[in-house]
Amino acid sequence: MDFVAGAIGGVCGVAVGYPLDTVKVRIQTEPKYTGIWHCVRDTYHRERVWGFYRGLSLPVCTVSLVSSVSFGTYRHCLAHICRLRYGNPDAKPTKADITLSGCASGLVRVFLTSPTEVAKVRLQTQTQAQKQQRRLSASGPLAVPPMCPVPPACPEPKYRGPLHCLATVAREEGLCGLYKGSSALVLRDGHSFATYFLSYAVLCEWLSPAGHSRPDVPGVLVAGGCAGVLAWAVATPMDVIKSRLQADGQGQRRYRGLLHCMVTSVREEGPRVLFKGLVLNCCRAFPVNMVVFVAYEAVLRLARGLLT
């Protein structure tokens, strides 16, 4: 049931967090936006509510699978550790047990998330590159006058969508191309998911009413939201490096590896570059993980009620 509960929680989290993800992507790829609220107002004015949910179908499928694997792996790993150490899978785990299980959960995710992360980053950076190319074509020395009947040539997009992007990367760069930046992804998800599950467990223990082993719904909301924020706080530096490595595609590559990317980025842009997107990620993480954990706990309680 942990796999099913994790999948349902993941889908609910996507439904809540996808609008902010859309805003984040548009801010990163469209220079016309001066800030978060400017992007929100413009998107709603032009496209209404559905504009915030464009392209939702693929993330729902992938996130539900990844969330299912994450929660399922965490619970099964924790049960095995408790069985080996205490002789009972339902024994109360220590913080070290929770940390180790959370880390294992994060590492297992990498195999599933790396290809989709590569496709997402390539498509986002492709959009930005196309916009820059259009501006150069319109303002350069060879720009076509406004009244010219023949429009300036605009490069065709290399990737036509997520699946086409995955197929193209696999064909041109091999299967290793689909796992580009996976070293940074391992470092990001390993310790961030250890933080995620440990902070959730500790906060649940603090917020549980006297005489109860689990918190009530408000307690789960607070614990889940705070766990998400703390996880993203420690994940953001490696998330920046991961994105830069994955965007560094075929041809003239800028980075030779994880360490070179980190050193080059910090030298050119300062240490603050490692925390780009931190505020928006944390703002999104709180409501998303509130919903994820409430849905997860609700499904588990429902299952226990049906089985007893």
Curated annotation (Swiss-Prot):
Keywords on record: Membrane, Mitochondrion, Mitochondrion inner membrane, Mitochondrion outer membrane, Repeat, Transmembrane, Transmembrane helix, Transport
GO cellular component terms given for this protein: mitochondrial inner membrane; mitochondrial outer membrane; mitochondrion
Phenotypic consequence of K24A: Impaired NAD(+) uptake
Superkingdom as given in the UniProt entry: Eukaryota
Annotated compartments: Mitochondrion inner membrane; Mitochondrion outer membrane
Stored Pfam families: Mito_carr
Annotated effect of mutating R284A: Impaired NAD(+) uptake
Gene3D superfamilies: Mitochondrial carrier domain (1.50.40.10)
TM helices/strands, residue ranges: 3-23, 49-69, 98-116, 190-210, 217-237, 273-293
Job description of the protein: Mitochondrial NAD(+) transporter that acts as a 'metabolic gate' in hepatic lipogenesis. Provides NAD(+) substrate to mitochondrial SIRT3 deacetylase and enables its NAD(+)-dependent activities in mitochondrial energy metabolism. This triggers downstream activation of PRKAA1/AMPK-alpha signaling cascade that negatively regulates sterol regulatory element-binding protein (SREBP) transcriptional activities and ATP-consuming lipogenesis to restore cellular energy balance. May transport other mitochondrial metabolites having an aromatic nucleotide and phosphate groups, such as acetyl-CoA.
Protein's recorded name: Solute carrier family 25 member 47
Source organism of this protein record: Homo sapiens
Gene name, Swiss-Prot/TrEMBL: SLC25A47
